[in-house]
């Protein structure tokens, strides 16, 4: 049995349509004191959302066959057009509107000061379920859930400590799929160096970086190679991150961070930086085919189509399906606070298609990746990262 790990150990458990588990009962334990949420906001408009320069923007729409359930969503500062986890999460909400007949509303945050105000505005409009998108809304969402026990909450890409049982974490063990990405990068590099960088040093970012580094290490052990990982030391948990302020939106900072890795010899980069990752795409495209990226969160060839020739594959998270299933659980009266943990085993995370790189990935590497995926899913390969979600 192969076992990879750095730092403290956190246990873990989980391309898309099968994330229907963990929505049945066992209430979560409520711990820690409630946190106060302040501020008030204008209720979401009864019009489709339009882009504005205001602090936040919102919309409230209903379907023709209403179910009586109102499901709502608040973005982080990257917004719903981030071509990443906010946009993917919103797709799940909009699918629920179409297929389940629920009414939906969304509010877009322009700064972190909007989080509490926006969630309160959704509470005030009588949402049955409020979905917060992203780790940065952690404390605000926990506080709101404690203050509003009759409202159901879910949070994407975060597992809050001390959350009440009306708050469901929707999280993904991307260490598993990033391990595959690391193995693939090590197999394809021509320079013997691959790289990764993050937006911020937070668990939902470093989980990718840990998995990626361990996948490279596994490839080296299997093949007797010495491919180097630049930008992240999984043992010391030190590495390259996009400069402040607003690192997930700092495209120029993402480009300069990627360029540093390219200058050091990396020819494949895994940017874990939201919209700032577009800077990495710009940097590799400028290399004239000498370097490429592995994208994260969503299929980059769909969300960043103009860069598809530079995207080998993507480490996806089934956020849209997880959001849809959370809404369905509310509609069906089966919602609870147990975390949903997407994994390779249930296709809640994985690698997307190779698209333009399909003919460039050797058949033996594709076969090896299938074996690696199977061995991770079965537990034969153990990946250990302090950032992995708790069961």
Per-region residue spans from a language model:
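Short, Lys/Arg-enriched N-terminal segments with co-localized hydrophobic residues
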Residues: 1-19
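Bacterial N-terminal signal peptides that target proteins for export
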Residues: 17-30
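C-terminal motif of bacterial Sec signal peptides marking the signal peptidase cleavage site
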Residues: 36-39
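A residue-level marker of the well-folded mature domains of exported/periplasmic proteins
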Residues: 41-391
């Amino acid at each position: 049995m192969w076992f990879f790990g750095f730092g403290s150990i956190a246990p873990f458990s989980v391309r898309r349509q099968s994330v229907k588990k963990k929505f049945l009962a066992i209430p979560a334990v409520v711990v820690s004191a409630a946190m106060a949420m302040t501020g008030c906001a204008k209720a979401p408009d009864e019009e489709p959302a339009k882009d504005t320069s205001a602090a936040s923007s919102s919309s409230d729409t209903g379907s023709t066959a209403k179910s009586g359930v109102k499901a709502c969503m608040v973005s982080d500062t990257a917004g719903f057009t981030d071509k990443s986890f906010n946009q993917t999460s919103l797709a799940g909400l909009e699918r629920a509107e179409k297929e389940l007949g629920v009414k939906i509303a969304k509010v877009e945050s322009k700064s972190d000061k909007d989080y509490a105000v926006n969630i309160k505005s959704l509470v005030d409009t009588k949402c049955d379920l409020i979905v917060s998108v992203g780790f940065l809304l952690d404390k605000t969402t926990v506080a709101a859930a404690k203050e509003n026990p009759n409202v159901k909450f879910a949070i994407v890409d975060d597992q809050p400590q001390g959350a009440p049982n009306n708050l469901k974490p929707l999280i993904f063990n991307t260490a598993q799929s990033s391990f595959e990405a690391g193995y693939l990068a090590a197999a394809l590099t021509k320079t013997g160096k691959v790289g990764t960088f993050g937006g911020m040093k937070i668990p939902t970012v470093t989980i990718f970086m840990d998995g990626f580094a361990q996948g490279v290490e596994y490839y080296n052990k299997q093949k007797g190679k010495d491919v180097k990982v630049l930008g992240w030391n999984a043992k010391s948990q030190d590495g390259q991150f996009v400069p402040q302020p607003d690192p997930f939106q700092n495209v120029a900072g993402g480009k300069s961070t990627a360029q540093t890795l390219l200058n050091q010899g990396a020819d494949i980069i895994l940017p874990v930086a939201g919209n700032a990752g577009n800077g990495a795409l710009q940097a590799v495209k400028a290399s004239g085919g000498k370097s490429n990226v592995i994208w994260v969160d969503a299929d980059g060839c769909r969300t960043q189509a103009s860069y598809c020739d530079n995207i080998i594959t993507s480490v996806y998270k089934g956020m849209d399906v997880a959001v849809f299933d959370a809404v369905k659980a509310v509609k069906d009266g089966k919602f609870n606070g147990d975390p949903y943990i997407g994994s390779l085993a249930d296709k809640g995370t994985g690698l997307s298609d190779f698209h333009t790189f399909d003919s460039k990935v050797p058949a033996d590497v594709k076969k090896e990746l299938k074996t690696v995926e199977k061995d991770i899913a079965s537990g034969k390969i153990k990946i250990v990262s302090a950032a992995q979600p708790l069961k």
